[in-house]
Amino acid sequence: MKMTSKKMKDELIKKLSRPEWDFQYDSEKEVLRIEQKDSKKGINVSLPGVVAKWEVNKEKAIEEVAYYVQEALIAMHKEENSGAKILPVIRSTSFPKQAEEGNPFIMTDHTAETRIYYALDSNKTYRLIDERLLQKLELTEQQVREMALFNARSLGYEFKQDTVAGNTFYFLNTNDGYDATRILNESLLQSMREKISGDMVVAVPHQDVLIIADIVNEIGYDIIAQMTMKFFAEGHVPITSLSFVYEDGEFEPIFILAKNRKKTDGKEKG
């Protein structure tokens, strides 16, 4: 049987059919939206991607996508009823891993320098989610991650821009406590990548700033290094003084690239 986006849509609707959920199919974009009838919150599933997974894993691919959608929608419903939002926050890898002895935080690896934690935000205060709080919330770690990333994508962004020696720097500083969190918004990163002509360099020196730079020369690398160090030193919640080159969805710390460059230069001289 040849699988198509339309057939995949039918398979997913069959798996996810519940009286409290609605389905909308955009045949032009090949996207299936599953949302809660009451809140209209939901998830968009790009069907060509699922079809590609099906070509390799067959039924398992459908089961996997259906499971993640179901987990995320259930978690959203619980979050809505609790009156608090769950959002990811970026922290240094040196940040404590436990709230107290025997009670670890819920965490996800991010880069060599950063780690993702999860915050329960009730507008006035927020608390990092640890295992005990997770049990009280009656959520799984996967539900927390899905919900947090969904909420991160809904955070607005408006950059200030500055150009120095041909290099363009974009600054996000809303002071909502989640500026660095925007680094997890893939669609934001991709849209910036499309407008950048040189190397795309990203920095989160502290939690209240995100810097994205279009670096076209060595001066640009010097400027971003100095800038990141300055912001890191001034930050209320410092994260990392290193910046990263962003390419193909991956973050590479600049000092690693510099080391590799030196090794290459050394070989050429030899």
From Swiss-Prot:
InterPro entries attached to this UniProt entry: DUF1444
Protein name per the record: UPF0354 protein BC_4690
Family (UniProt): Belongs to the UPF0354 family.
Pfam families: DUF1444 (PF07285)
Organism of this sequence: Bacillus cereus (strain ATCC 14579 / DSM 31 / CCUG 7414 / JCM 2152 / NBRC 15305 / NCIMB 9373 / NCTC 2599 / NRRL B-3711)
